[in-house]
């Protein structure tokens, strides 16, 4: 059962208005405080849910914004699918701890019940969006505030019937928010579980509305190899094709685009290099790590390797 809570958002008014140095985190806290003091961010009077809709290149993605339980994260109701980098995680822990706020939501996905989709659409049809604007990147953002107690209660019941939520983006933000929450629990041994630090900001989208974007890796060097030797090593596990003149984006599983020495290449993994029954091992990210990054480029742990 997924525990999802309404919350009182700090919402922007319509008017627009060394990386790890301690002063960076202090400045973030100062900026947040200033936005509250100036009324740029205004906290709603009661805990609400929010419908968040994005429209990009004709594709619409609509989800519900609320707060997810850190206990759900720890007990596996919120499913993770990638490891985090220690340096990025520590940076975000410091940021959340300093601001005492989740400044960005975790992007979650699940199978939406038809009844929850109907509820969202009905609310949109009968209420005006609190925000409706298009950014310079041509992505349109719309937000509706769900503030009626009866509807909030219905959403609570809908999420109680959902077995799992999956992190689509925000593994570092989620891990950091959870660790700060656990720290707050240590500081407040009499906590009830209802305090805000027991939850992290999330937006849950229907899985079938998601658009998968590339997640690229940049490696600083070829581990002492020449370009010719590097390409030769890849041919043991991949079919290589030179793709002159334009970026190569994969269009099917077990294919990758690679840019090296000013040239684009299309890589297709030979079918005998991964075990068909190994669900994790046949993921493209696993093939990249086990057949390229580790054996050829000498990168044992991408989480900590500075290259």
Residue ranges and their predicted role:
Residues 1-307:
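Surface-exposed, charge/polar-rich loops and edge strands
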């Amino acid at each position: 059962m997924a525990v999802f809570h309404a919350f009182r958002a700090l919402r922007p008014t319509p008017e627009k208005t060394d990386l790890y140095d301690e002063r960076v985190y202090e400045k973030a806290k100062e900026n947040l405080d200033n936005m509250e003091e100036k009324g740029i961010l205004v906290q709603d009077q009661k805990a609400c849910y929010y419908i968040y809709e994005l429209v990009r290149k004709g594709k619409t993605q609509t989800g519900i914004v609320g707060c997810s339980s850190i206990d759900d994260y720890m007990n596996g109701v919120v499913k993770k699918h990638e490891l985090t980098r220690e340096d990025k995680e520590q940076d975000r822990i410091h940021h959340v701890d300093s601001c005492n706020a989740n400044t960005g939501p975790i992007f979650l996905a699940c199978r939406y019940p038809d009844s929850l989709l109907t509820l969202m659409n009905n609310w949109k049809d009968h209420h005006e969006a609190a925000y409706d604007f298009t950014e310079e990147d041509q992505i349109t953002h719309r937000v509706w505030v769900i503030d009626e107690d009866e509807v909030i209660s219905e959403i609570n019941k809908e999420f109680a019937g959902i077995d799992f939520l999956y992190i689509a983006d925000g593994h570092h933000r989620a891990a950091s928010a959870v660790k700060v929450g656990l720290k707050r629990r240590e500081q407040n041994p009499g906590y009830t579980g209802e305090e805000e630090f027991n939850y992290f900001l999330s937006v849950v989208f229907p899985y079938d509305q998601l658009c998968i974007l590339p997640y690229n890796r940049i490696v600083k060097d070829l581990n002492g190899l020449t370009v010719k030797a590097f390409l030769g090593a890849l041919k043991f596990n991949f079919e290589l094709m030179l793709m002159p003149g334009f970026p190569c984006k994969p269009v099917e599983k077990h294919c990758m685009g690679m840019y090296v020495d000013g040239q684009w290449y299309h890589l297709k993994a030979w079918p005998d290099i991964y075990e068909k029954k190994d669900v994790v091992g046949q993921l493209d990210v696993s093939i990249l790590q086990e057949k390229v990054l580790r054996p050829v480029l000498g990168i044992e742990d991408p989480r900590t390797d500075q290259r």
